[in-house]
Amino acid sequence: MNFPWDQLLVKGNWMITMAQIGAPFLVIGLIAVITYFKLWKYLYKEWFTSVDHKKIGVMYLICAVLMFVRGGIDALLIRAQLTVPDNKFLESNHYNEIFSTHGVIMIIFMAMPFIFGLWNIVVPLQIGARDVAFPVLNNVSFWLFFAGMILFNLSFIIGGSPAAGWTNYAPLAGEFSPGPGVNYYLIAIQISGLGTLATGINFFVTILRCKTPTMKFMQMPMFTVTTFITTLIVILAFPPLTVALALMTTDRIFDTAFFTVAHGGMPMLWANFFWVWGHPEVYIVILPAFGIYSEIIPTFARKRLFGHQSMVWATAGIAFLSFLVWVHHFFTMGNGALINSFFSISTMLIGIPTGVKLFNWLLTLYKGRITFESPMLFSLAFIPNFLLGGVTGVMLAMASADYQYHNTYFLVAHFHYTLVTGVVFACLAGLIFWYPKMMGYKLNETLNKWCFWFFMIGFNVCFLPQFILGLDGMPRRLYTYMPSDGWFLLNLISTIGALLMAIGFLFLVVSIVYSHFKSPREATGDNWDGLGRTLEWTTASAIPPKYNFAITPDWNDYDTFVDMKEHGRHYLDNHNYKDIHMPNNTPVGFWIGIFMTIGGFFLIFETVIPALICLFGIFGTMIYRSFQIDHGYHIPAAEVAETEARLREARIKEREAVSHES
């Protein structure tokens, strides 16, 4: 076993050197704080080993916000480099590393855990379930994601980051990228992807088997419907990525030749594998985002969602078509006119079900009694901005025109108008919307609105000029340009917009900190002035009790909770409580994550024997779990009755306070 010590430390860049010096101090400081406040046992027992879907969701969201910061810093470094012509702020390879990691982090390690965090917190509550179908697997899934996240971020200070773009095309990612950088990409995404696939299976089964028996599919909230359909995409799309990553890993570590032309390999095989996963991946993050908008818009329009069934069918149509469009990512790679024509038409067809959704949201707003809370502001801003992303997407879908737009900043502007407005706006809106359900208090609305205005205006200032830059011929992934190119002014404006977005995000961080200390606590559950329309708002706030629902709720219409409130009924009015069975916490996922992180690290540096030892550790942990007799535990009916009585009393007091104010 010869570990490549000479590849361990990245040298020659002042930013990386500062990170290498600062990272140990950050870790030591974090350990010191946890030790000082004696939190190790609490964190391990209550969080790291928890199988409670709500706590797992919170851990996903914490990771997602941290990765938002990391990906945002990458974006600011990119904009700093391109602000002025002939800039020497970053050298070319470091710039390549930054735009590569920016894409991976924002898609894989920010957007997906943000969505999965909201799935975990909201979906079981929306369907009347006490937990997900496989609670232990849910914990394992999180730690697989966490292991991948740690490994990928470790690359910045140990070994070097991948520099072949977020698409990691062969042969650039093969023989032309020596060192551990691309290995970090392959192993980290592989480990995280296993967790994602397990999450998809888990929530697919949860929605099918754990929902309240009276809830029919067409009566489910749209966030749950979009989650269910997205899990199907996850189950079908991630295996091709898993295969592609495994093949390239064997190419790099074991000298196979799946993608090496000199030995009979096919680089285009990677492009097809990647985009067979890559374009459905866009809908893996954007369909749940559509579900978030479909919850927020009816709530603050005080109206039933228009065309609920057509929204369900439109979501299914988008999911189906998402597997028929991947070639539009490489129209210029010599596919031929017939193939390009087919994929051009199939790409345009996605605009039809997407248009159905847009019109349904607009018709929901029509004659609604709209109030402009911050989640609603993000949702309203999404519609026109996403429309611009969709229209430019149709332009790019025209294969002949794509030869002009391909690999220019026009494409960069397009997919940011699609993903930032479609996903990031939704994540921020969803976080603010369901934050009181998680924490028991709302985020400060004034600070939230400052966040919205800075972020939304900054977004348009940043990316609108990039359409013009692309039409003017500026290639993407260009690390510098000459004054004679004439791109300085628009790049300067774009950088100013990025700074405004960063300020907007800082307002959200300030809102989270400020609200923790200052916002009034709300334990009753229906936190947005009694406007809740779905089952999660019937439960208590501040992470509802472990069992979620004391009795199985009845649900016989899309807006049953609205009808219940209008007639003064509540599912808690039934006092016939029984003992509730719950699963025990388990350390299995945590230790699998530890073994995956250590084994993945050694495999990245092509040191196979320690990686195999860690693999045996993973199998040993799984075998230990298989032979463990764990029947869970029961919450006594008396304890349930006491908890529900407290919640009922708090709800009555809140109703009396509201009546007194009115």
Swiss-Prot record:
The chain crosses the membrane at residues 14-34, 58-78, 103-123, 140-160, 187-207, 228-248, 273-293, 311-331, 336-356, 376-396, 415-435, 451-471, 493-513, 587-604, 608-627. PROSITE patterns: COX1, COX1_CUB. The keyword Metal-binding applies. SUPFAM superfamilies: Cytochrome c oxidase subunit I-like. Its cofactor is Cu cation; ferriheme a. It catalyses: 2 a quinol + O2 = 2 a quinone + 2 H2O. It is a multi-pass membrane protein. Binds a copper B center. Heme A3. Heme a3 binds at H414. It is found in: Cell membrane. Fe(II)-heme a binds at H102, H416. It holds the Pfam family COX1. Its EC number is 1.10.3.-. GO terms for biological process: electron transport coupled proton transport; oxidative phosphorylation; respiratory electron transport chain. The keyword Cell cycle does not apply. It is an enzyme of class 1 (oxidoreductase). Cu cation binds at H279, Y283, H328, H329. One of its GO terms (cellular component) is plasma membrane. Belongs to the heme-copper respiratory oxidase family. This is Probable quinol oxidase subunit 1. It comes from Staphylococcus aureus (strain COL).
